[in-house]
Amino acid sequence: MPTINQLVRKGRVPQKAKSKVPAMEQNPQKRGVCTRVYTTTPKKPNSALRKVAKVRLTNQREVISYIPGEGHNLQEHSVVLIRGGRVRDLPGVRYHVLRGVLDTQGVKDRKQSRSKYGAKRPK
């Protein structure tokens, strides 16, 4: 513990807050090009084939982002928009692909939570 005199001389240095989504550079969304689209398995108690894409962003950073919803049309060279938001059971996946924007189609036959999956209102 510092003495009063040490605090008078130096003072306390506030800690810097570290960003959870550094590749976004303070932007709400970023555009990028898929370099690889593949499936991966989640951490221990869960079991599935989660769809993810490696995306090269406009700032030249490569990130892994999750493709939400059932079915997708993404392949290599697809242009996507990503947002922040990690996937808890996939280590290293800190971003989500936005559905229904640019080359990504919305989820087909989606009735609830449509806005999150880029699905149009059913007739």
Swiss-Prot record:
Skewed-composition ranges (Basic residues): 9-19
Modification type 3-methylthioaspartic acid: residues: D89
Keyword Cell membrane: no
Annotated InterPro entries: NA-bd_OB-fold (IPR012340), Ribosomal_uS12 (IPR006032), Ribosomal_uS12_bac (IPR005679)
Keywords: Methylation, Ribonucleoprotein, Ribosomal protein, RNA-binding, rRNA-binding, tRNA-binding
Superkingdom to which the source organism belongs: Bacteria
A GO cellular component entry from the record: small ribosomal subunit
Region called Disordered, residue ranges: 1-29
Family matches, as CDD domains: Ribosomal_S12
GO terms of molecular function: rRNA binding; structural constituent of ribosome; tRNA binding
One Pfam short name: Ribosom_S12_S23
Complex formation: Part of the 30S ribosomal subunit. Contacts proteins S8 and S17. May interact with IF1 in the 30S initiation complex.
NCBIfam families tied to this protein: rpsL_bact (TIGR00981)
Family, similarity comment: Belongs to the universal ribosomal protein uS12 family.
Role according to the record: With S4 and S5 plays an important role in translational accuracy. Interacts with and stabilizes bases of the 16S rRNA that are involved in tRNA selection in the A site and with the mRNA backbone. Located at the interface of the 30S and 50S subunits, it traverses the body of the 30S subunit contacting proteins on the other side and probably holding the rRNA structure together. The combined cluster of proteins S8, S12 and S17 appears to hold together the shoulder and platform of the 30S subunit.
Entry protein name: Small ribosomal subunit protein uS12
Lineage start: Bacteria, Pseudomonadati, Pseudomonadota, Alphaproteobacteria, Sphingomonadales
